[in-house]
A protein has these predicted regions:
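Positively charged n-region of N-terminal signal peptides that target proteins for export
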Residues: 1-4
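N-terminal pre-ligand scaffold of iron-sulfur
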Residues: 18-89, 104-105, 120-135
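C-terminal motif of bacterial Sec signal peptides marking the signal peptidase cleavage site
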Residues: 12-16
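Short cysteine-rich clusters marking metal-coordination/redox-active sites
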Residues: 74, 94-96
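Alpha-helical transmembrane segments
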Residues: 7-11
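Short metal-binding segments enriched for Cys and/or His
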Residues: 102-111
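Polybasic, low-complexity RNA-engagement segments
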Residues: 114
Length: 135
């Protein structure tokens, strides 16, 4: 009887141990094509805002063939009205307009402010001409 009680308690307690309490950014379908070498020109170590996603997208070009694509909604409190990341003048970091969390654009990790969460990334492929962004 004692073993049965322990097993039942473990079945109740253990599944709750791995619960992810990270706030969820609402899902919005994304399928965008950019031409970073022509009309949508993006310099190396430069960026472009795109009107897509939940609160917008920022495309950061690390090198000729390497991009990082992030949701502009802050992962700390996605439901906060007006919360949107903007790239700072250094073009290396960005900051949320409400909670003031700061993120590194090369990998999306937080380095200041209250957010312990990285920026949400979108998938992308680049064929040398077109940059396809999707989720």
């Amino acid at each position: 009887m004692r073993i049965l009680t322990v097993i039942i308690l473990l079945l109740i307690v253990v599944p709750g141990c791995n619960e992810d309490n990270r706030p969820q950014i609402p899902y919005v379908y994304v399928n965008v094509t950019l031409y970073p070498n022509t009309m949508d020109y993006i310099n190396t170590m430069g960026y472009k805002y795109v009107n897509a996603g939940y609160r917008g997208i920022v495309v950061f070009r690390i090198s000729q063939d390497l991009f990082m694509v992030y949701e502009r909604c802050c992962p700390y409190d996605p439901e906060k009205t007006g919360a949107k990341i903007t790239v700072d003048p250094s073009n290396v970091t960005c900051v949320d307009s409400v909670c003031m969390s700061k993120f590194i654009l090369t990998d999306g990790t937080p380095f200041g402010g209250p957010s312990p969460y990285s920026l949400m990334q979108y998938h992308w492929t680049y064929d040398g001409d077109a940059l396809y962004i999707y989720n």
